Amino acid sequence: MGVYYMRRRIQVEAEKPQFCVTTGITFAQADAWFGNTVQDLKLDLIYPRDNTRKYPCVVWICGGAWIQMDRSAHLAYLSVLAHQGFVVASVEYRTSNEAKFPAPLQDVKAGIRYLRAHADRFNIDPDRIGVMGESAGGYL
């Protein structure tokens, strides 16, 4: 009788935050293959649908031992941050197979500049942008 009574009395109402996922946004073009070609640098973005306020942004930089990278690999994990009220941007950078250092660092900085320049479009508070990463991305 006690469990039945509690089930009737306790009602849990939770609303999932709604967010958008946009992939493949070109934020810059850069020389690739050591100056022999041009490459579009892209980012993936997870941002709340609610456009009534600005949100802090977390820029995610994936790892890959400097020789490979997949900016979309962790979007499922990063969506947890979006549920907590962050805009999350996963940025692409050139690897050591494509360009010499400091090219990867310049690419990440270009991504952050793009996010600041388009802060209104994605509901980003340009004064609250943080960076995190793993492996090579953590160094950048």
What spans do the regions from the language model cover?
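Short beta-to-alpha linker loops that shape the active-site pocket of alpha/beta-hydrolase fold enzymes
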Residues: 64, 87, 92-96
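Short amphipathic alpha-helix adjacent to the substrate-entry channel of hydrolases
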Residues: 72-90
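Alpha/beta-hydrolase active-site loop
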Residues: 99-120
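Gly/Ser-rich "nucleophile elbow"/oxyanion-hole loop immediately N-terminal to the catalytic nucleophile
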Residues: 53, 116-135
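Short N-terminal helix/helix-N-cap motif within the alpha/beta-hydrolase-1
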Residues: 68-72, 98-99
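N-terminal cap/lid segment of alpha/beta-hydrolase-fold proteins
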Residues: 2-53
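Short beta-strand element of the alpha/beta-hydrolase
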Residues: 54-64
